[in-house]
Amino acid sequence: MAANSTPEGPLPVGEVSRLIGGWIDRLGAVWVEGQITQLSRRPGAGVVFLTLRDPSYDISVSVTCYRQVFDAVADVVGEGARVVVHAKPEWYAPRGQLSLRAAEIKPVGVGELLARLEQLKKALAREGLFAAERKQPLPFLPQLIGLVCGRASAAERDVLENARHRWPAVRFEVRNVPVQGVHAVPQVVQAVKELDARDDVDVIVVARGGGSVEDLLPFSDEQLVRAVAACRTPVVSAIGHEPDSPLLDLVADLRASTPTDAAKKVVPDVGEEYERVRLLRDRARRCVAAFVDREERGLAHALARPSIQDPHRMIEERAEQVTALLDRGRRSLRHHLDRADSELTHTHARVVALSPAATLKRGYAVLQRADGHAVRDPGEVEPGETLRARVSEGDFSVRVDA
């Protein structure tokens, strides 16, 4: 329950420390898992001092135990080992310091570690951190490569030498960090984040030259896995441990079997690229030559056509054809005109011969009554009626006598 206090009636530091100690005492003994980061065994001392650290959250707590408790596991436990401790929390009031008094220490075996890693792997996989669609492609020719590795390590040498042998102009930004032990995870995470924050870094390589399962535990740490998953820069894992791949291999954008393999996958080989360029150049030359040859043959075929070799000949042939057609047209037109003229003359003669004027010229006359009606029958006129007689050269009046 909360202690009663007010601004006017605050609790003294000693009282607060005593209350905290009381709450901690009521907690009782607990099982705690962590990694031993410091170990102090003074000769002749009956107490062993340890520092137990949670690598995922970088939180540590002091642990004390009797020598006989530690001696029971001294052969298999040392700095960097993961252990499970059965301990009672203690509060040292004068310093306001929390510690654990261990009554039993158990090392975490490889089998148990692998089982826990498998559980973590499944949990992270359910979150989609290992999904293929999250993988980023590596740049074809990175200008600056970030390298996270141990100082003066074989992994660093393998990556640098092989990459520069393949592409001498490549540059590196190297971050030397512990790659095993209690300080590995926070420093590797920090190095990855620093390189990822730089705009000029094209790809990040995390390299280590293999090791035991325990040595490679930092590269399966959840904190590191999530840091790599959050990177905007492509990350290559080159831990070099085939049988049991750390979780970093699964979350990285590309897994390399060794640091040397990482160098080969990150940068192209200058000799291979020169050869590829040569082959492409030869192929382009052959394609251009074939194209030019094909076009030359087509041009030669076109030039061989009569219309190209002697263009005037075709025009002259057409001109002769036009002249012949004109002559034929004139002859045909003249023939049609002559025949039409003959027919017209013949028709005109017939018309003239059959016309009333020709009949009158032969001595005939046309009698017309006063209303202009031609007389065809004697019964149409009456005695004494005046008629108009029309002859070839004119007309005159006549009177009907009887």
From Swiss-Prot:
Q: Cross-referenced InterPro entries, in alphabetical order?
A: Exonuc_VII_L, Exonuc_VII_lsu_C, OB-fold_nuc-bd_dom
The places in or outside the cell where this protein is found are: Cytoplasm
- EC annotation? 3.1.11.6
Give me the reactions it catalyses. Answer: Exonucleolytic cleavage in either 5'- to 3'- or 3'- to 5'-direction to yield nucleoside 5'-phosphates
Pfam families from the entry? Answer: Exonuc_VII_L, tRNA_anti_2
Q: Has the keyword Nuclease been applied to this entry?
A: yes
Q: Which GO terms describe its cellular component?
A: cytoplasm; exodeoxyribonuclease VII complex
Gene Ontology terms describing biological process: DNA catabolic process
Q: Does the keyword Cytoplasm apply?
A: yes
Listed GO MF terms: exodeoxyribonuclease VII activity; nucleic acid binding
Q: Which domain of life is it from?
A: Bacteria
Keyword terms of this UniProt record: Cytoplasm, Exonuclease, Hydrolase, Nuclease
Q: Which NCBIfam families match?
A: xseA
Record note on quaternary structure? Heterooligomer composed of large and small subunits.
Cited function: Bidirectionally degrades single-stranded DNA into large acid-insoluble oligonucleotides, which are then degraded further into small acid-soluble oligonucleotides.
The record's similarity note reads: Belongs to the XseA family.
Its protein name is Exodeoxyribonuclease 7 large subunit
